[in-house]
């Protein structure tokens, strides 16, 4: 295996996980904050807000998992070798 390709794959895997987690992390923080504000304003709508929040958090977390899958593919099933 070419050491340059191996080093680039490790760097790309780290960047894939790091950059794929920035957006969902910010989005999850914002969504959770807005949900807490919504529940504080309308406590009777807590169940509906919480259900919607959990569903949206799952969709956002999927983006981070996709970045992890790309990183694992680069590390263990490298297509460039």
Curated annotation (Swiss-Prot):
The chain crosses the membrane at residues 3-23, 57-77. One of its GO terms (cellular component) is proton-transporting ATP synthase complex. Disulfide bonds: none annotated. InterPro entries: ATP_synth_csu_bac/chlpt, ATP_synth_F0_csu, ATP_synth_F0_csu_DDCD_BS, ATP_synth_F0_csu_sf, ATPase_proteolipid_c-like_dom, F/V-ATP_Csub_sf. Keywords: ATP synthesis, CF(0), Chloroplast, Hydrogen ion transport, Ion transport, Lipid-binding, Membrane, Plastid, Thylakoid, Transmembrane, Transmembrane helix, Transport. It is a multi-pass membrane protein. Pfam families: ATP-synt_C (PF00137). One of its GO terms (molecular function) is lipid binding. It is found in: Plastid, Chloroplast thylakoid membrane. The keyword Chloroplast applies. The record marks 61 as: Reversibly protonated during proton transport. F(1)F(0) ATP synthase produces ATP from ADP in the presence of a proton or sodium gradient. F-type ATPases consist of two structural domains, F(1) containing the extramembraneous catalytic core and F(0) containing the membrane proton channel, linked together by a central stalk and a peripheral stalk. During catalysis, ATP synthesis in the catalytic domain of F(1) is coupled via a rotary mechanism of the central stalk subunits to proton translocation. F-type ATPases have 2 components, F(1) - the catalytic core - and F(0) - the membrane proton channel. F(1) has five subunits: alpha(3), beta(3), gamma(1), delta(1), epsilon(1). F(0) has four main subunits: a(1), b(1), b'(1) and c(10-14). The alpha and beta chains form an alternating ring which encloses part of the gamma chain. F(1) is attached to F(0) by a central stalk formed by the gamma and epsilon chains, while a peripheral stalk is formed by the delta, b and b' chains. In plastids the F-type ATPase is also known as CF(1)CF(0). Belongs to the ATPase C chain family. This is ATP synthase subunit c, chloroplastic. It comes from Gossypium barbadense (Sea Island cotton).
């Amino acid at each position: 295996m070419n050491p340059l390709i191996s080093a680039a794959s490790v760097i790309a895997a780290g960047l894939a996980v790091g950059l794929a987690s920035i957006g969902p992390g910010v989005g999850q923080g914002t969504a959770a904050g807005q949900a807490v504000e919504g529940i504080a304003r309308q406590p009777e709508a807590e169940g509906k807000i919480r259900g919607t929040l959990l569903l949206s958090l799952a969709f956002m977390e999927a983006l981070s998992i996709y970045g992890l899958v790309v990183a694992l593919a680069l590390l263990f099933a490298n297509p460039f070798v």
